[in-house]
């Protein structure tokens, strides 16, 4: 692992909530938790990503494993994986025994759905790799995902939108701009020293 990845993971790992934004504008922003937890026994840089609605915290609507790798100096690639059987690991963020059961063979690499991350003066900026090839099925229709995030200190902003492959019109995703999350728990202490 490089110093750049170690610094990024130390900044990323934790639990985030957009409670303030959701309470101020409930019609446009659901109250969501984002959680990034190291999976120590998998390849270095492997992070469990969980997204849940506050009204249903025990049933993540998105469960992924991302793996950080520095491609060239200062550019981090986040390899994006989904689970073959996500229900088996829905409690893995807070249940260490469940988390320790995750194996490489439980994961499916999501083609063309990886992120490139750069560290700039105002924090880390991540964007889905270019090419409009990360396909997401939503409401019976194929769309391509456009996704970005900005991590600075304890603040994380994200924007995910799905677009029609033919017309490039927005089909789903935020109409009111970015989701703004605040860190409520820091989990950097769970990162193995060998990763840093």
UniProtKB/Swiss-Prot annotation:
InterPro entries named in the record: CpcT/CpeT (IPR010404), CpcT/CpeT_sf (IPR038672)
Top-level taxon: Bacteria
Lyase listed as a keyword: yes
Pfam families tied to this protein: CpeT
The UniProt record lists the keyword Transmembrane helix: no
GO molecular function, one term: lyase activity
Main function: Covalently attaches a chromophore to Cys residue(s) of phycobiliproteins.
Keywords linked to the UniProt accession: Lyase
Protein name according to UniProt: Chromophore lyase CpcT/CpeT
Gene: cpcT
């Amino acid at each position: 692992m490089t110093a750049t990845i170690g610094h990024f993971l130390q900044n990323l790992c934790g639990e985030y909530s957009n409670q303030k934004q959701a309470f101020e504008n409930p019609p446009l922003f659901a109250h969501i938790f984002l959680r990034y937890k190291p999976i120590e026994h998998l390849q270095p840089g492997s992070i469990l990503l969980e997204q849940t609605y506050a009204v249903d915290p025990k049933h993540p609507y998105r469960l992924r494993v991302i793996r950080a790798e520095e491609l060239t100096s200062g550019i981090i690639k986040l390899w994006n994986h989904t689970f073959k059987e996500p229900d088996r690991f829905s409690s893995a963020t807070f249940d260490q025994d469940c988390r320790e059961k995750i194996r490489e063979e439980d994961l499916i690499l999501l083609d063309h759905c990886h992120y490139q991350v750069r560290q700039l003066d105002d924090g880390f900026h991540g964007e889905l790799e270019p090419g409009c090839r990360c396909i997401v099925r939503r409401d019976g229709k194929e769309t391509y995902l456009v996704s970005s995030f900005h991590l600075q200190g304890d603040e994380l902003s994200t924007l995910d939108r799905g677009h029609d492959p033919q017309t490039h019109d927005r089909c789903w995703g935020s109409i009111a701009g970015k989701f703004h999350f605040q860190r409520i728990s820091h989990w950097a202490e769970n990162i193995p020293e060998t990763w840093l």
